[in-house]
Design a protein with these regions (language model features):
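Intrinsically disordered, low-complexity N-terminal segments that are enriched in acidic
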Residues: 23-209, 213
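C-terminal motif of bacterial Sec signal peptides marking the signal peptidase cleavage site
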Residues: 17-20
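Active-site nucleophilic cysteine motif
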Residues: 249, 256, 274-292
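Secondary-structure boundary elements
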Residues: 218-274
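Hydrophobic helical h-region of N-terminal Sec-dependent signal peptides
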Residues: 10-15
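Bacterial N-terminal signal peptides that target proteins for export
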Residues: 1-9
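Hydrophobic/aromatic-rich core segments of domains that either
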Residues: 282-349
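Low-complexity, Gly/Ser/Thr/Pro-rich intrinsically disordered linker/tail segments
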Residues: 81-87, 97, 127-143, 334-369
Length: 369
């Protein structure tokens, strides 16, 4: 009995102690961890941080090219007076840059100090639609300018712009390049457009944006129909020619001349020459270029003057040498001419086409080279 009483007392004491354990979880504890910088402090990885005026202008130009209407720039360890530089940079963007002259109406800003750095909220108002600004081409060389124009022709753009990092090119130079691109894309240009070029450079001249307008006389659907007809006509005309032979370029010239027997005085295209059968020197040269392209014969349309009058002709490769060939001056006999032979009556920009140094010669159908 005595042992049972002692066991009962011990059991009761144990139960009381276990009940007291619940109060342990009601106590407060201190948790420690390393200090972290607030997330709104500027870091070196933050791409919006601006440290000098040059960086500020780069950021503004980038945002304008992306058609950003409102954005925030953060100034970290800035070298200069932020308020003064912001005012100057916004004015320079609007009046002193090509992108500003092309499409920016106004630029405004507000600043706010945020802990360890300054933020500027920039607002840009544009005077052109977003689609025009975002589709500005960028070019560095004459070849890249031509590539941009060809892309615009292929897409049937009537208005487009090219940004060029140069101070030497003027509107007449760019218009000539656009014209050359049109002449040498006979499959695309089936209605020769009028060309208008406007330059935008602001008060600076390190960069220029050239706005180009092409005005056609037929609709987009008509252009597509003409391209299809011309493609079929070229395939028909070249089907009887054998590619790779020395005489093939000369035979191709006769094919073009026979397909276009009527001469007109208005500016024409390969479509006019090969589908309608009538063309001036422009149309004949473009038609020959179209046929040579189909046969993989190196050929180019040259724009120049003949006895003081605007004229187009071709420079074509025959047996490894280049020659001038003016189809508007030929009959059944072809006169392949050198640069020296042409200079007396023709004028052209020498570096616009390959050099023709080989001796001139006359070719008649059926002859072997």
């Amino acid at each position: 009995m005595h042992k049972r009483c002692i066991a009962g007392i011990l059991l009761a004491a144990l139960l009381v102690s276990l009940c007291g354990c619940t109060s342990v979880f009601d106590k407060e504890y201190l948790s420690e961890r390393p200090y972290e910088e607030p997330s709104n402090l500027l870091t070196d990885a933050d791409t919006t941080q601006i440290r000098n005026y040059a960086g500020l202008m780069r950021a503004l130009n980038t945002m304008a090219a992306q058609y950003e209407r409102s954005f925030v720039l953060a100034f970290g360890d800035y070298d200069g007076i932020i308020a003064d530089d912001l005012a100057a940079a916004c004015e320079e963007l609007r009046t002193g840059t090509a992108i500003g002259a092309y499409c920016i109406e106004s630029v405004s800003y507000e600043t706010e100090q945020v802990i360890a750095y300054c933020e500027a909220s920039i607002t840009i108002t544009y005077n052109r639609p977003e689609s025009e600004v975002r589709s500005i081409y960028s070019a560095q060389t004459q070849k890249s300018i031509l590539d941009c124009v060809v892309d615009a022709l292929d897409r049937q753009k009537t208005q487009f712009a090219i940004q060029i990092s140069t101070s030497t090119l003027e509107t007449d130079d760019v218009a000539a390049l656009v014209r050359s691109a049109c002449l040498n894309q006979p499959q695309l240009v089936v209605d020769f457009p009028s060309i208008d070029v406007t330059v935008y450079s602001g008060s600076g001249n390190s960069q220029k944006i050239f706005g180009i307008t092409l005005q056609y006389s037929v609709s987009e659907s008509a252009v597509n129909d003409r391209r299809t007809q011309l493609d079929g006509r070229v395939r028909t005309l070249t089907s009887a020619l054998t590619t790779g032979e020395q005489e093939t370029p000369l035979q191709a010239a006769l094919v073009v001349m026979r397909a276009c027997e009527q001469r007109i005085s208005t500016v024409s295209t390969a479509y006019d020459a090969l589908v309608n059968g009538s063309a001036d020197s422009y149309g004949l040269a473009m038609a020959y270029k179209a046929v040579c392209d189909a046969l993989n014969i190196p050929c180019q349309v040259v724009s120049g003057r003949f006895q003081g009058i605007d004229r187009c002709w071709n420079v074509v490769q025959i047996d490894g040498n280049y020659y001038h060939l003016d189809l508007s001056m030929q009959s059944e006999t072809l006169w392949l001419r050198s640069d020296e032979s042409m200079r007396g009556t023709y004028q052209w920009t020498a570096d616009s086409c390959p050099t023709c140094a080989a001796q001139s010669f006359i070719w008649r159908e059926g002859e072997k080279l």
